[in-house]
């Protein structure tokens, strides 16, 4: 009779995927010329979209996995000094499960008697912008260039955070053209990793070890 149960996490694979997409976007930008084929430009855009979505998915999966590890009392995450936190996170899970990503992180900090991230802090603002960009791509709604709302707001939030796509016509729309370049892809990966690292340090839990042959390099 089988007595061993196996529980597989995905968050670290999502981080590796995001970094791979960013590296591939960088490689295409180094190769591209003004005469580059539409096929290459399509690949480049796909890598950038993948990096954004996978970076946000890493944050989403990581916090979900943490709550479920609390329920399971995973000893590698919740040692003897964190049993109170594990019990509180277990109790909170059904309430918080469907809430936005950042709310889950902030709530975990509160349960651990740690100060939540100030909403005006750079790292919080960056992740909020990343999640909003991910949502805009996943739940995409086109907007007329004379009636920009969500896309205009995103450009204002993101416009100076990274270099714009060097392969895009500067007169084209911010989303999906000027925004989605290696600058955006790399920023997405680094934003997600930095936030998660700061979160675990703040909460006093061990950070996840991400085994990646390229060391999560973004170019």
What are these regions (language model features)?
Residues 44-70, 138:
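Short, hydrophobic, well-ordered secondary-structure elements
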């Amino acid at each position: 009779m089988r007595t061993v149960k196996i529980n597989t996490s995905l968050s670290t694979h999502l981080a590796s995927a995001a970094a791979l997409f960013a590296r591939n976007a960088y490689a295409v930008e180094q190769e591209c010329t003004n005469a580059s084929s539409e096929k290459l430009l399509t690949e480049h855009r796909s890598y950038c979209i993948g990096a954004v979505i996978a970076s946000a998915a890493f944050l989403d999966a990581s916090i979900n996995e943490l709550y479920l590890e609390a329920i399971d009392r995973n000893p590698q995450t919740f040692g003897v000094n964190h049993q109170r936190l594990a019990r509180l996170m277990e109790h909170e899970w059904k309430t918080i499960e469907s809430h936005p990503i950042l709310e889950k992180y902030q709530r975990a900090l509160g349960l651990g008697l740690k100060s939540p991230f100030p909403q005006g802090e750079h790292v919080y603002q960056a992740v909020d912008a990343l999640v909003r960009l991910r949502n805009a791509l996943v739940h995409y709604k086109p907007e007329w260039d004379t009636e920009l709302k969500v896309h205009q707001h995103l450009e204002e939030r993101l416009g100076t955070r990274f270099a714009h796509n060097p392969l895009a016509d500067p007169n084209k729309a911010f989303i999906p053209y000027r925004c989605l370049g290696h600058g955006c892809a790399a920023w997405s990966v680094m934003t997600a990793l930095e936030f998660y690292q700061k979160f675990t340090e703040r909460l006093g839990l061990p950070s996840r070890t991400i085994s990646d042959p390229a060391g999560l390099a973004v170019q």
